[in-house]
Amino acid sequence: LIFFSTLKAYSQMTPREVYQKNVNSVVLIITKNKDGSKSKGTGSVIDSSKVITNAHVVLEGRDQMPDEILIFLSEDNFNDESQKNYKKGRSAKILRYDSDLDLALLEVKRIKTVPAIGLADSDQVMVGDPVLAIGHPESGGLWSLTSGRIGSIIKNQSGIKGKHVFQTETSLNRGNSGGPLLDGNGDMVGVNTNISRRSSDGLAITGINFAVQSNVLRDWLRMGGISLANTAPQKSDQTDVGIKKKEKVNPEPKKQTQEMESLPDNKLLTPPRPFDDKDLFNLFEDE
């Protein structure tokens, strides 16, 4: 069962408490491609053996799959470059995905004891609310924590019906794709998905990042037959809109991934441990 938070706490947790509550439920995703290249993203354990991430983390374009998907836990690799710590990759397969919503559900072996992240009712989130993100930004530390606030609430982003997102200033970068956007109670209010880096005339844009709302994720999971417990009420105008017809199930494996564009990471709360992606990929081996 996937648990949703239904009540707000009287006093919110500190960023440190939110991080400690959820860091073991956030995974590193490494995709291996037939041409030998690799790429990375972030995911969240939301149920026994199930991880949610972005479709673009495990797809090239809209429907081409990588040759292999490996999942790593913080307990395996936490900011340690020693070769031995990078031999614990858990094989994952895609159960379903939706390229328009930019969501993908993975099934992963041997993570049944990993705690699941709770999903909040995103209808209760308001502009100005503080939020946090955990992920693996390029050139930053693995399992990094960044902070910000909700800047705007957007429905039907890019004209895609049912794709309701939060705009946030929370610092994100390549590698944060698919990771959780967390509220002050440590529950997921969104799945970090993309950022704006430059306008059409080339002007630099900073602090404009987006996360698919947790209620969109909840409805999409329900359409796939994933049972939910302690589900918070949801507004009728955000229920099951434009999701079912776009869903893909059990696609054939193909090749590589896409990731977010980068932004300056000026709100890194964890001690920086820079990783060059090429060096990082060379360390990873599956069991």
Could you say what each language-model-derived stretch is?
Residues 12-19, 66-69, 73-80, 87, ...:
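C-terminal cap/linker of serine protease catalytic domains
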Residues 21-36, 108-116, 143-222:
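Active-site region of chymotrypsin-like
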Residues 54-56, 136, 194:
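Short, surface-exposed secondary-structure boundary micro-motifs
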Residues 81-93, 127-132, 143-155:
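Beta-strand/loop subdomains of soluble extracytoplasmic proteins
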